Amino acid sequence: MSDSFYRYDVIVIGGGHAGTEAALASARAGARTLLLTHNIETVGAMSCNPAIGGIGKGHLVKEIDALGGAMARAADLAGIQWRTLNASKGPAVRATRCQADRNLYRTAIRCIVEAQPNLTVFQAAVDDLIIHHGASEADSVRGVITQTGLRFQAPSVVLTAGTFLAGKIHVGQTQYAAGRMGDPPATTLAARLRERPFAIDRLKTGTPPRIDGRTLDYGVMAEQPGDDPLPVMSFMGQVSDHPRQVSCWITQTTEQTHEIIRNALHRSPLYSGQIEGIGPRYCPSIEDKVVRFAEKTSHQIFVEPEGLEVAEIYPNGISTSLPFDVQLALVRSIHGFANAHITRPGYAIEYDFFDPRGLKASLETKAVGGLFFAGQINGTTGYEEAAAQGLLAGLNAARHVQGLPAWSPRRDEAYLGVLVDDLITHGTTEPYRMFTSRAEYRLQLREDNADARLTGVGRAMGLVDDARWARFAAKQEAVQRETARLSALWATPGNALGREVADALGVTVSRETNVLDLIKRPELTYATLMRVPTLGPGVDDAQVAEQVEISVKYAGYLDRQRDDIARQQRHETTPIPDGFDYASVRGLSIEVQQKLERVRPQHIGQAQRIPGMTPAAISLLLVHLERARRSQVA
């Protein structure tokens, strides 16, 4: 085998949502990339819920897409039921979600991966990292060693091991080593990583039993059809990309369900002390819900199809690790599930994760140069959170090799920026899930403007191809052209346009009014305004129309938020040098020094967000940094 077979610029370990986005981003950025996976057949597999998007999560998917990523495109090709959540609320919190055919989704991701230039896939489990220990320099990664002893070399490595590091499955009192049900864990790699200078702990997640949908009584459930018209996830997508659409269904647990669970809690690994890892707060098991919300007589369950050509359904809301006999009893006590056949048991899985405060904003580890972490191993939960981290880590792994500066978005630029800043500043003791409420500038960080925020940046770094760039440029030009057209038109009580507005919309124009200002009225939208003969029919691209309307209707709020951001940014990006000696700053308390030493913030903005950090301490830091800067100039 040629030497080039073993040498790459970037190696990505793991072919899940983080790993595929990392490998694709690295390759798009121009790095010769190797994706190592224990099983090529599971590249892009949806291990848990067959769905993409949702509140906060859909925003991340749109950002991944704006940067040229694959998740949104795959969702458009696999989405079998589509909904816009919070559709009646403001644009900041509207979110796209699709139920996906897991086989179509996996196929779409694999096709995208295999079509990507600069990217090679090889099936091999990784057992160790090759680390260079320099006498006078920091440790740095040099490659990986596989289970079969192959040594692949690269100056950048991205680890995206998901739940596989020392993974342990629990079903009742039964427990065994696994990365997920049916897949072996990365036990040797986990042991080697524990020998490295990383802070490692355990987390837990779970999944519900799967059910044969042919054994359910849908007549007692509430049908939940998708939206009409259908949304799309990708800025490059169109409704014709979607496969055949189906409904989901809604049912509830019963008091009998809760009684079965309460009587079996002593057999639950969650309550017996068998499971040590902390699970996701916002996706609790059914036994956890019954205990925590004892006053409730029922809990909602979403009955979600796993695909168009399979009978299995995913009962969203009954994740459990109870013994199988208890699972069978509780499932059959649910409305419409009396004759349900379980095809796969529910289970909990514990796994190793790394304290994300040991990462830079680029997702490079502070302890080992060139080594990047992404996904669940950083303490997050969810496909979307993993994929977003993967894209960022893969990009920066490539830039590390190319000698280019790392990139990470700020909190006011992307939900990805919020995600990373939260993790590396605060760390986490439970699986971290993205919500719109985590972003202080969420009116700026909408799904609809993710391309306006990020596609230009992605293009400059090589992530965005010509087709996407051309589509984006055409959309931006159309928005500007339509805004200019409307801004040039005025309605008065006496002119023809004013009379048309009154006749078509029943709106009285009492004084000279710019047409754009009419959109600011609560009762008017761009679409209703286009019913005025002189103004219509308007643009036929819904995305363009949406941008025109939002930019006008929310102009005052957006301007105020931009002013807030400008004030915040005055010192946000002031860098703090690597290895900065906090003990040298006179006046800093020991407590503050310890907090700063533990997090090692890269800039003042990150330091400000450390819990317990005082304005006085930040002022002292700024004075010291400015004094040091002046002395260097002198």
Curated annotation (Swiss-Prot):
Binding site for FAD: 14-19
Gene3D superfamilies registered for this protein in UniProt: FAD/NAD(P)-binding domain, GidA associated domain, C-terminal subdomain, tRNA uridine 5-carboxymethylaminomethyl modification enzyme MnmG/GidA
MF GO annotations: flavin adenine dinucleotide binding
Cofactor: FAD
Record keyword NAD present: yes
Positions of NAD(+) binding: 279-293
Signal peptide range in chain numbering: none
Paired cysteines (S-S): none
Cell compartment(s), UniProt: Cytoplasm
Main location: cytoplasm
Keyword set, alphabetical order: Cytoplasm, FAD, Flavoprotein, NAD, tRNA processing
GO process annotations (BP): tRNA methylation; tRNA wobble uridine modification
GO cellular component: cytosol
Pfam families: GIDA, GIDA_C_1st, SAM_GIDA_C
Function field: NAD-binding protein involved in the addition of a carboxymethylaminomethyl (cmnm) group at the wobble position (U34) of certain tRNAs, forming tRNA-cmnm(5)s(2)U34.
Quaternary structure, from the entry: Homodimer. Heterotetramer of two MnmE and two MnmG subunits.
The family this protein is said to belong to: Belongs to the MnmG family.
Record's protein name: tRNA uridine 5-carboxymethylaminomethyl modification enzyme MnmG
Originating species: Xanthomonas axonopodis pv. citri (strain 306)
Gene that this sequence comes from: mnmG
